[in-house]
Amino acid sequence: MTGVGENQLISIQPDELKFLFELEKQSYCDLKVANKTENYVAFKVKTTSPKKYFVRPNTGVIQPWDSCIIRVTLQAQREYPPDMQCKDKFLLQSTIVPPHTDVDELPQDTFTKDSGKTLTECKLKVSYITPSTTQRSSESGATNGDGQSSETISTIQRLKEERDAAVKQTQQLQHELETVRRRRNQRNSGNGLSLKLAAMVGLIGLIIGFILKLTLASPT
């Protein structure tokens, strides 16, 4: 078994899973797994708390010198862990497989240690970060003259303002569109009524004309 982030077959970045922890909210961390060999390498991700995390993909095959992204999602939690300390751990197993092997073709004993094949393992620790910690880090960076942090905050604020303006404009356009629809419906309703009146007047005229014709045609 190799150390954190170290593996003879693959490289893993980052070497620690860090999640922004907020109650009733999901959080995720992406792992980049790169194949460092000229062979096809299969991998499998295991965790000590499988009900707490959602891993996709948790099993896969990486082509030679290629890489893939594994997304580990922390499910929404209802309470804070003691002292915000996380004892969860992840284990990433990897082994060489025949060329052009598909993940659906992997035998059940691919990641079994007594299968006679070389199986390397890499442990990953888990840590939680609170929003307040992130905010303090940003403020500390600004205090130390980190212009990039202040620039990032300004960018976020600008994006929020643009989003609010776009939402307001969308609502205004929807209101105007609804007004146009109401006016058009009223106009169509008025035109329908006018046509009905015209039809009735025409019908009455025909009846009167028919009666007059009969009257004139009657012998005196």
Curated annotation (Swiss-Prot):
MSP domain span: 9-129
GO CC aspect terms: endoplasmic reticulum; endoplasmic reticulum membrane; plastid
Region (Disordered): 133-154
Keyword Zinc belongs to the record: no
Residue ranges that the Swiss-Prot or TrEMBL entry lists as coiled coil: 153-188
Keyword annotations from UniProtKB, A to Z: Acetylation, Coiled coil, Endoplasmic reticulum, Membrane, Transmembrane, Transmembrane helix
Sequence positions bearing N-acetylmethionine: 1
Ranges annotated as spanning the membrane: 197-217
Annotated PROSITE patterns: MSP (PS50202)
Entry-linked SUPFAM superfamilies: PapD-like
InterPro entries, A to Z: Ig-like_fold (IPR013783), MSP_dom (IPR000535), PapD-like_sf (IPR008962), VAP (IPR016763)
Record membrane topology: Single-pass type IV membrane protein
Its biological purpose: May play a role in vesicle trafficking.
Family per similarity comment: Belongs to the VAMP-associated protein (VAP) (TC 9.B.17) family.
Designated name of the protein: Vesicle-associated protein 2-1
Organism: Arabidopsis thaliana
Taxon lineage: Eukaryota, Viridiplantae, Streptophyta, Embryophyta, Tracheophyta
